[in-house]
Structures are given as C-alpha cells and as structure tokens.
Amino acid sequence: MELVNEIVEARNFREAWMSVRRNKGAAGIDKMSVDVLDVYMPLHMDDIKQSICRKQYKPSPVRRVFIPKPNGKQRPLGIPTVVDRVVQQATAQVLNRIYEPLFSEHSYGFRPNRSCHQAINQALDYLNAGYEWVVDFDIEKYFDTVNHDKLISILREQVNDSATLHLIRSFLKSGVMEGGFVSATTEGVPQGGCISPILSNIYLDKLDKELESRELRFVRYADDFDIFVKSERSADRVMASVSRWLESKLRLKVSATKTKVVRPTKSVFLGFTFWKSTRGWECRPTDAAKEKLETKVKQILVRKRAAAQPMSYIFTKLNQVIRGWVNYYHIGSMATYLRDVFGPWVRHKVRVVIVKQWKKCSTIHKNLLKIKSIIKSKITDDAIYQASMTRLGWYRQCGLSTINYLLNPQVLALPRANRTDKSKSRPGLVDPYALYQSLRSPICM
C-alpha cells in the first residue's frame, strides 16, 4: 500500500478533520472558518483525496501573522486555510506513525507523551552526573531557513512514495500572503501549520543521530538544544565542531553571539535556569519568566480599566495567568518568590482595585465592617474607621495593616456570588504559593 493511500484513507482523513475542528484556530486567506468544515468536507472530500493521489492538490498560500516574542521581537506565523490544515494533519498523522519509533529519546518537542518538564529533568540528570559545562546552542531563524531539497532528501530515506513527497513539497512551496501580495517560499517550514512540527523534528533528527554517534549528553526541544560536558575545554571543542556540522550538513546557521559555553547557573533552557543546592542541581524560573508573569498581571490590573470591571471577571483572568504559569514552572524551586514576593505583591494590587471600586469612604467602611463580621475578626471598629477615612492615596491606603488584615489571602480566595446564576459561585483569587505546594506534593510528583 502506497503511503499516499494511508494519508487519504477514510479513518485517517476523518481523524484529521476532527482534530482540526477541535483545535479551532484562525482562518486562512480564504476566510473559511473551522465551523464551515462540517458542511464543506462531506461535499468535497472525495475530490480532495483524488487530487492528492494524482499529484494535483495545490495548497493555498499561508496567511502571514506576527506574534510577539519575549525579547520584544516578532515571530512570523503562517496560517493555512482550514482545508489545507486537514490535509496537513492527515499527512502529519501518517508521518508520525513512521518516524515516532525512530526519533531519539533525547528529543522532547512536538512529540506525544513528551514534555518540557521531561526535558528539564533530563538536563538535571546530566548536571547531577557531573556534566556541569553547558553548550547553549541557538540556530538562527531555524523554521525560516530549513532547506527544502535537503528536507525532501531526508524524507526520501523513509518515504518511498512520489505522491506523498510531492504533496509535502507543495506545502513547503505554497507561498506566503502578506498585505495582499503573495511571495514565494524558497526555504523554511512556516510555523502555524499542522505539518510543521513533524517536519522540523525529521530535519533535526539527523542532528540527534550525529550527537548520539559522538556519545554526547544532550537535550533537544524543537530547535532549542543544550549539550552537557565535563570540562570547559571539551565544551569549546564541541561547540565548534557541532556548529560546523550544522552549517555543512544541514545548511543551518548557528548564531555566533547567542551560542555559548556557560556554567549551569548562566544557562537558560525552556524558561528555566539552574542552581546548586545541598541536594544537588535544581531548576527555577528565569528572572525574565518572572517579569513576564508580573507584566501580564499588571495588564489585567491597570487601575482605570480594572476599576470598571467586575472583580469576578478580574479574578478569573488573574487565575488563568497564575495557574498557567505555576503549572508550567512548578517543577522549579520558587517557594520564596511565590510566598514572599509575588503573592503579597499581586494581593496588594488586587486590594487597590477592590478599594477603588468601593470609591467612597463610607462604602469602604461599610464593606470592611461586613468582612469583619464574616471572618469574626477582633479588630476594632475604630481601627476600621481610621483605615476607611484616611486621606492616603489608594495604593498607600491598601498598605495599611487593617486593610491588609481584613482583605487577607483567605478572604480574597472566598468564592464570589454569580449575579447571572445564583446557584453558582465564581472562584476567588487563587493563592499562587498554595497552588505551588499542592503541585509539589508527593501525590502529584
């Protein structure tokens, strides 16, 4: 059975269709939404399959969009049409079945049942085994510079089917529409398509095999990879030889300024850096990762905008950001940061928004008395009155011990009434430190 027949096989194609529908996503240049697939695909599926088998399928150019990168620059994405996404997904599913058993155990990106956490734990294993010099590699614009001919040549080693190779090349050459104009794509695998992850892994699997043949300790997540060695001299030698190999064999350019030999404490990998405790090497979020979290919180709590929004909405938005960040970074050491720095900081900013929404001193006084009654506090009514009637600005007022005590973490975490559905309550503010502790508990580890 030729491989192209596996791609267009009914079950595989329907699985691809359902996958695209589940993942939603933006429309391509034809502006067709995912919702239209249920009507479009039954009418056109047979024609699409026949055109693929006859090497006549012509993908549309991808729609260029840009998303911000942590360093302030922008990452270009190519959004295929929803029909092209179905065909790409069907192709990717077949390629995954072929290549997944062949991929290196040191590759963690874009693979089933593999994660960033596993990659970080592998790096820690190397460090704790004594490989304490790190070669941080940076491939310049990897996804934009993959050589098409080289990729097809690599694919041909496992894919002996001209129709499948023709289909993949047609996606690589489909072009990019930006500002109403279509430009040709002579190199690169546009990020944003369903097939891009598997193709990028197939290309860099050659690197994995080369590093394994040299018996090097390495971890790769997509185009982000580190090599771990025992001495600085070995690290310098490895950096030079692997850089030459990448440029000569895979035609990829290694960044001379960003690729460097460092100690683990200066290494940055997948948002983590490393430090040595009495227990050995551990990981923790980088300062840049913390700054990104705090920036997102500030954007939600911009005072003028936040003061006009329901607190239940603000808490929902904050909880999404905090849960997402803590869930990702919880394998790292950050108890002190969450308990003593971030937690108190975010709660103070929330108190400012709450008090500002109350506006009048009389309203502040009334609500603080109500909270006192609920939590059965022994704080005096006079202290509450003084805190309510102060002439301090919002920010300094919310730093007063009385308001801090009454609007404490437990109070902020209380469920809030849902005005549209009285039978349901909306969650209060999640405690980042408590969430971290729950994820770090032995049951969760």
Cite the ranges covered by each PLM segment.
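Electropositive, glycine- and tryptophan-enriched low-complexity nucleic-acid-binding patches
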Residues: Q88-H106
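Short acidic (Asp/Glu) and glycine-rich catalytic loops that position anionic groups and cofactors
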Residues: N23-D30, P70, Y99-F103, Y131-W133, ...
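Non-catalytic, polymerase-adjacent accessory regions of viral genome-replication enzymes
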Residues: M1-P42
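A conserved non-catalytic segment of reverse transcriptases
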Residues: K173, K249-I314, V321-R323
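Right-hand nucleic-acid polymerase module
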Residues: V302-C361
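Conserved phosphate/pyrophosphate-binding and hydrolysis machinery centered on Walker-type P-loop NTPases
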Residues: E6, D30-D38, P80, G109, ...
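Conserved polymerase palm-domain catalytic core
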Residues: H44, S51-F66, P70, L102-K266
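Extended C-terminal regions of large enzymes
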Residues: W345, W358-M445
